């Protein structure tokens, strides 16, 4: 589960637990490499594209930082209705002031004394002790905290149906799949939910998040921007070592190659026929390069 959270080496070790095991991978936000493997025919795909009963689509907006206080007013309106909200920041601590980003703890402290004075606010980040993180998250899940200011530590394993609004600061610093994963922390109940991306740059790139909730379409855009990485190596992004082919523009050719490979392996699964010696040697060299 949450396949995108595992590195290439980790997934390979899991697959080696048995002898040629069947492997089922699940993710709402496939990484570019996964989408590339689907295109290459290494993975079969099943898509569950229906919302669970009672849930509504999440509305997503992109705003300029100048409109942040209007967004805060929108959040307070929902807090006053008894709902809960997230504000997500890219930084855990100070040290990146040159990037114009604010430490999540200082940011939360400022919110408590200014815009959200009188509201119950908590902070959550990855450098907290496990017991502290668990306590903070449990308090939020129980409805005792109204607003949770957090880093991407909330990206996975958080299910609070009463949380209906998420504001993401410096949205341009997150990957598309990561933004989609974060957005999935809201809209888990019956309330209409809203995700607000605060940024003053990369509007074209982020517009795909606004326009779709389809994880595969978002992964496809990520694939165009980041590249799929190595298919047989450990890099999960970057351009593959293809001299002529383009995996996005040559999908029809890839499908022909998939069908030809399937027919060949049906006829000669172990590539033992003399006519396949050269192909077998090339495949072995490819696997040796990747240490498979």
Segments predicted by a language model, with ranges:
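Inter-lobe coupling/hinge segments of SF2-like helicase ATPases
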Residues: 1-207, 217, 267-272
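C-terminal accessory region of SF2 helicases/translocases
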Residues: 190, 202-292
